Amino acid sequence: MFHLDTLATLVAATLTLLLGRKLVHSVSFLKKYTIPEPVAGGLLVALALLVLKKSMGWEVNFDMSLRDPLMLAFFATIGLNANIASLRAGGRVVGIFLIVVVGLLVMQNAIGIGMASLLGLDPLMGLLAGSITLSGGHGTGAAWSKLFIERYGFTNATEVAMACATFGLVLGGLIGGPVARYLVKHSTTPNGIPDDQEVPTAFEKPDVGRMITSLVLIETIALIAICLTVGKIVAQLLAGTAFELPTFVCVLFVGVILSNGLSIMGFYRVFERAVSVLGNVSLSLFLAMALMGLKLWELASLALPMLAILVVQTIFMALYAIFVTWRMMGKNYDAAVLAAGHCGFGLGATPTAIANMQAITERFGPSHMAFLVVPMVGAFFIDIVNALVIKLYLMLPIFAG
């Protein structure tokens, strides 16, 4: 086994991103279907490591100590760039999107349990291949698998959960681009151009140019560091209470409170462009690390019936995004970008959703509403409603005892 330390892993992640960029610009298929650069590069590296593992018996182990801080830094930038006025304006849209998301959670579990029963598997495996890991991700999967082991005696719950979450992360990044590209073509907005081309003015005067200087970067890094520090403290204080929240949600909300508080007091205005640059860097590096570190041989160990459930879930996610998400959200360009985001966190995670949306907006134009709604629902509300839906399913007679 080869072990790469923190710095070597960072080098590998940056090279993976550059490789992904080269691939997307060189391979017409990837460019045509708007595959995110971290997904393209990360998957190629993961496949290369799989070949090394199977042919030579070599395994490369990465030091992922930077991965979680990078993810938290990304969510901090989402919070710092959110202003209260925009949140109020997006209230109705957030409500509609949340209803759409709840519908998917219910259907994912119904499909998982139905397919598991049809294939003669434990219904708990169907739940693990449902909203627990697909909409919930690795963290939610790990948390629920512990409960399944202790309460239901499902000894392989953790392995199944991690494999399903990994599969979902990969597919979530792959189907978002093609789905959105199809929807943009059929959008009610002429030529796929977004209705909202206005420059966001939450913290910036669009007519006044500002440089991203070293001082601005230091100020922005300080704000992000404060969000991470305070967010972790808040998460620890809430742990074990009825108000317990994942750390990244606490970090996001600290960012919202910090930026709006400073703005209201007139003490400091967050430089949106600098925050966005650092957020994009954090997200790209996080995704590169997450994907290049995938142990694809763990997917190969999944039984064919489990793979069958996951394939059905993936097809259903794409159809749901096209026929439900896009239509419910208005059948316009914003709705198409939202659908791409829904594919991302409906099968994988919120960072995958953001990467999907970035890949679309870089090509077709901005969608301020999508970048406001998806992080709010995907990073906060999804954990709450998913837990409620899962608990309701566990009350069914098939899970008694």
UniProtKB/Swiss-Prot annotation:
Keywords: Amino-acid transport, Cell inner membrane, Cell membrane, Ion transport, Membrane, Sodium, Sodium transport, Symport, Transmembrane, Transmembrane helix, Transport. Residues 1-6, 53-69, 117-156, 236-244, 293-301, 391-401 are periplasmic. It holds the Pfam family Glt_symporter. Inhibited by the uncoupler carbonylcyanide m-chlorophenylhydrazone (CCCP) and the ionophore monensin. GO terms for cellular component: plasma membrane. Catalyzes the sodium-dependent, binding-protein-independent transport of glutamate. HAMAP family: GltS (MF_02062). This is Sodium/glutamate symporter. It comes from Escherichia coli (strain K12). The gene is gltS.
